[in-house]
Amino acid sequence: MKLIIISGRSGSGKSVALRALEDLGYYCVDNIPVNLLPTLTHTVVDEYDQVAVSIDVRNLPKNPDDLVEILDYLPSSWSMTIVYIDASDDVLVKRFSETRRLHPLAKLNKSLSEAIRAESALLAPIAERADLYLDTDKLTIHQLAELIRERILGKKSSRLVLVFESFGFKHGIPKDADYVFDARFLPNPHWEPDLKHLTGLDAPVEVFLGSQPVVTKFIWQIQNLITTWLPHLERNNRSYVTVAIGCTGGQHRSVYIAQTLSKTFSEIHPDVQIRHRELNQ
């Protein structure tokens, strides 16, 4: 099992890092008490092979030595990486001031600056054990997410799921669509008596539409658009991109085009899904 522990001072970007790992398929737990870490990992070991947890100052044991013992208690067969995320005191003060959030140690009657410095001392034991230290002073949220993927996982892009969906305009446009293409101008198998009761998944309809130059060109242009911009979408912290193809009823043209595109992209992209909305109802 691969275990990633995210820690660092409040406001440094721990939540952003954890979300980036969740998008990559990690089972994530936010702000787990350290003394429950062995129990959690033993509980999920049979269900998940990639687990990420975040630990903040509120969940540390009172005795710093206990932290070392807890981490050492974890099975040596597990691959554990500790990531410590931090920023300068001035930047953390600015972030708290802009968001008007209350620092976790503010209840100790400390000023914001004092709380930030005190937090650093309390987190020192886990910072000393860190395998990777990330300074977020000059990073945006998206840059931090990309850095997490690149430094920890050895890849700049998350596993973006590319979804092709067919639909009928008379039933409404899918609300989750990122791109919508209108195929209603293309030759319609509905008006062919032998094809009317078939769908875009049936061979006779595939032959009919595949022999139409305008259909072939339409598919090629969609394919070219998605191929051009897919790398940029992957680097933009996206988990899903849904490409919706619509015709009048969602039975022939849109089904054929969505199915054709999904087959093409399955050869060049690791995670492609296909949905035929009207056929599944």
Swiss-Prot record:
Entry superkingdom: Bacteria
UniProt keyword list: ATP-binding, GTP-binding, Nucleotide-binding
Keyword Mitochondrion tagged: no
Record GO terms (molecular function): ATP binding; GTP binding
Residues holding GTP: 56-59
SUPFAM superfamilies cross-referenced by the UniProt entry: P-loop containing nucleoside triphosphate hydrolases
Residue numbers binding ATP: 8-15
UniProt record similarity statement: Belongs to the RapZ-like family.
Function summary: Displays ATPase and GTPase activities.
Protein name according to UniProt: Nucleotide-binding protein MADE_1004170
Organism from which the protein derives: Alteromonas mediterranea (strain DSM 17117 / CIP 110805 / LMG 28347 / Deep ecotype)
Phylogenetic lineage: Bacteria, Pseudomonadati, Pseudomonadota, Gammaproteobacteria, Alteromonadales
